[in-house]
Amino acid sequence: MSLFKVYARALRYLGAYKLRVSLVVIANIVLATITIAEPILFGRIIDAISGKGEVKPILFMWAAFAVFNTVAFVLVSREADRLAHGRRATLLTEAFGRIISMPLAWHHQRGTSNALHTLLRACETLFGLWLEFMRNHLSTVIALALLVPTAMSMDLRLSAVLIVLGIAYWLIGRVVMSRTKDGQASVENHYHTVFSHVSDSISNVSVLHSYNRIEAETKALKSFANRLLEAQYPVLDWWALASALNRMASTIAMMVVLIIGTMLVQSGELRIGDVIAFIGFANLLIARLDLMRQFATQIFEARSKLEDFYTLEDSVRDREEPAGNGEIKNVKGAIEFRDVSFGFGNSSQGLHNVSFSVKAGQTVAIVGPTGAGKTTLVNLLQRVYDPQGGQILVDGTDITKVTRKSLRRHIATVFQDAGLLNRSISDNIRLGREGASEEDMRRAAEAAAAADFIETREDRYDTHVGERGNKLSGGERQRIAIARAILKDAPILVLDEATSALDVETEARVKAAIDNLRQNRTTFIIAHRLSTVREADMVLFLDDGRVVEQGGFDELSHSNGRFAALLRASGILTDEEVRKAHTTEAA
């Protein structure tokens, strides 16, 4: 993407404040135009002094002009600051809302730390561009457009020096940008690596402490930081060289203007005031050229950050739901999978032609070896992914034809990892239903057998649970997650290995709460502990993404198939029980 396109797209975000931004820009253009009068007035003062003319009127005019210019600049800058800060805040919340609403598959592919880093850096970069646009960018272009013809009207010979200076600035900037383009892109990649490493290490700090990896991870970060600097230093060297060359060019230009001006004054072709005024013009021009150089540098350094952000934004919009999707309402809970297939591009795992139907209120246990596709199946039901083949119907409606939001309104999920936010117990339970009353929230906690431990806490329901609930035990976290699901009161329930990480005593308490939660709900249970699936109306045995066995618990446990073998291996079913069952059936 060209620098112009990067900049133009950045400015489009200001569209929400068109009127206010336009007024600020116009005010800055007026100030830039008025500034041109300063060297002219100064030249007139010099002429008046050297010619012993009346100086006071011009001095008063110059002073008034300086006061007005200063006050106006402060007011305009204040408004520009407010606009830039306001737009940054709204962009952050808008982009956050779009990103967090994306399917989980998108987040798994993109990476949480990558999206976060891209968003935060882009917001700061855009803030700087917006601020400079309203303060300097356009006014600098206008000032240059006015300064050159005004200077030429005063003296073509001196103006030629300034034009050559402008060309020198342009050539230096172009050469340096071409030399550092790849280097700057490499710098941004290294920044992403550093941020990802820090984020990954901090989020897994308990593992690092457990395995004494603190020094190793710190050493790795230092290595990443050194690579960043190795990529950054050559870029900085080129821009330092550009700054030195620009300074040299402007110094030479001023010396040439002074020499030529002195010669013209001595020959009587110009007055001293004209030369002084022209030197003022030259200083203004050099200042504006420096601003243009800074502007070009700013855009150049922003390019990689903003291109990443634009790619992020575009991928979000590409994955947004079709406008025609409707809402699903009054769900009873009847579910049907019709030849559903799904695969991951970088893995052989997935689902292949899965078909089954569940009546409203039934409980389905999904079992099978690791990697069989159990979690993928329930993720497809919740539209974490969309099927690549076949259909999933809820009450006869294809779920790809309804919005994810309306579908998930009717599904409550209890994960193996409870997934608590670093907020109060009350806030975490209320995630189940927005606007739930205090009474409903407490009733859900009681139904989940969570009220007893909550009441022992000093702050009770206002107790903060810590990051990911680390101030609570595993059983306590899980009961809060169950309370959240009870409060949601959805007709479809998904239990994704909800008790596999609990001890036997805690599991018994949590299971009682889950049994209460399952009543009159269509329930999908993923469990490694096969003792939890005895009460299922249907058992699906998955292997390699296919349903290899399907039926009731008693039916499959006595069929001498894969499920029965798994029960025997886990000690739940003995060979003697299988023989007795076969004898009974034969009789």
Swiss-Prot record:
The chain crosses the membrane at residues 23-43, 57-77, 126-146, 158-178, 248-268, 272-292. It is a multi-pass membrane protein. The keyword ATP-binding applies. GO terms for cellular component: plasma membrane. CDD domains: ABC_6TM_NdvA_beta-glucan_exporter_like, ABCC_Glucan_exporter_like. It is found in: Cell inner membrane. InterPro entries: AAA+_ATPase, ABC1_TM_dom, ABC1_TM_sf, ABC_transporter-like_ATP-bd, ABC_transporter-like_CS, NdvA, P-loop_NTPase, Type_1_exporter. Residues 335-569 form the ABC transporter domain. SMART domains: AAA (SM00382). Its main location: membrane. This is Beta-(1-->2)glucan export ATP-binding/permease protein NdvA.
